[in-house]
Amino acid sequence: MEETGIKDCVIEEICDLAKKYGVEKVILFGSRARGDYKRASDIDLAASGGDILQFALAVDEETSTPLRFDIVNLDEKICEELQDAIRTEGRILYEKI
């Protein structure tokens, strides 16, 4: 997924951590999903199901990237504008089958 500026190994790490913590879905959104990111842009993720808090902590600590993560819990109420952004520009990175 190099067009997002995120190395494939980091995507794999995110997916592995989603499985580990029972997360059902992880969506990339924001500048990295749109392709208009800068080199140091953070990685915006929206996640649902499972232990989102532990997933978020692990993603920050255990992935092999110096980039910062901003993780939105889709199981909680979020503003309409953010919902629209996730819906329109989101790219599914992981979905439990």
Where are the predicted features?
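Catalytic core of pol beta-like nucleotidyltransferases
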Residues: 1-25, 33-39, 48-97
